[in-house]
Amino acid sequence: MIRNMKVLVIGAGNAGRPAARLLNHLNNRVLVNDVRELHELPLKAQKRIAEMEDEGVMFRFGGHSMEDILWADAVFISPNIPQDAPVRKMVREAGDLVHITTSDIGRTLNELIGLPMVGVAGTDGKTTTTNMIDHILSSRYRTVSFSSLQDSLVIEGLVELVVNGDIDDRDLAVFELPHGTIRMAEGLELSAGVVTNLTPDHMDEFSNYDEYIERNFSIKDLMAPGGVLALCGDDPVISSLLDDLEVENVVYGVGERRTVEFMGRRFMLSQYPGQGLRYRAEGTCRIHLHPECIRDTDSHLQHLRSPQLQET
């Protein structure tokens, strides 16, 4: 872990703040730099920044300076900072700095939390699915949930658990992984994941639809060894990705034939397995519910036959 260093965090937004707070918790001296003025940030961010200042995190707004970069031993650059931003060139010119990545932050969180985690990705239905899962599991386990319903960012919420020492009071975490947040989740290991659907949305933030799909489907890279990814087989885009999927997965659906159209591209299921559900495989799912009290639940996973995707 990164400890006892002078760390410059570039960007005071939704990626930079939780990274800075975690690094400060690990006994680093942390300075957060942002090109914007404080009053230009959302009120919620301003409130969080005030709390972080009370914890010892330093902030400087209104621009970036070489003096701040040279002060640091290490730097974390928010993934939201454009690749051609002048500050990235300044960092390169500064020379020998330790570069802290989003993956470093995720792995550190993963190690400090030590809880089984369930993540929900996709375009529509993430909040509903997250809260349904939390509602079911909370009847038996001490869960913590982060979603739009709670108006909470998952990485900020997980860092809060670590900083406040609330981990021992929880058995597992359930959270929503929107397209913006999922980049900061790299390094986490999920016991289970869900992808609801992959229809076009927020396309002004992506160069093309394929980039949007890749970002949201990157939840597959967060699965822990033995973890299971649940995927909606009714979605033709998800169905097109099943053959190359290397993680343990279960495909669910109700047999609805759906079509996705975007910018001249049309995705549809060319065939579907009959009425209702047909099953293609049987497996065993082991759910690790707490490091100190592991409960292995064996259940037969019934998978849908992989429908064939046709793009016209």
UniProtKB/Swiss-Prot annotation:
Keyword match Magnesium: no
InterPro entries registered for this protein in UniProt: Mur-like_cat_sf, Mur_ligase_cen, MurD
Keyword terms: ATP-binding, Ligase, Nucleotide-binding
GO cellular component, one term: cytoplasm
Single GO BP term: regulation of cell shape
Residues at which ATP binds: L112, I113, G114, L115, P116, M117, V118
Lineage top rank: taxon: Archaea
Transmembrane segments: none
Gene Ontology molecular function terms on file: ATP binding; UDP-N-acetylmuramoylalanine-D-glutamate ligase activity
Family membership noted in the UniProt record: Belongs to the MurCDEF family.
Protein name: Uncharacterized protein MTH_531
Organism, scientific name: Methanothermobacter thermautotrophicus (strain ATCC 29096 / DSM 1053 / JCM 10044 / NBRC 100330 / Delta H) (Methanobacterium thermoautotrophicum)
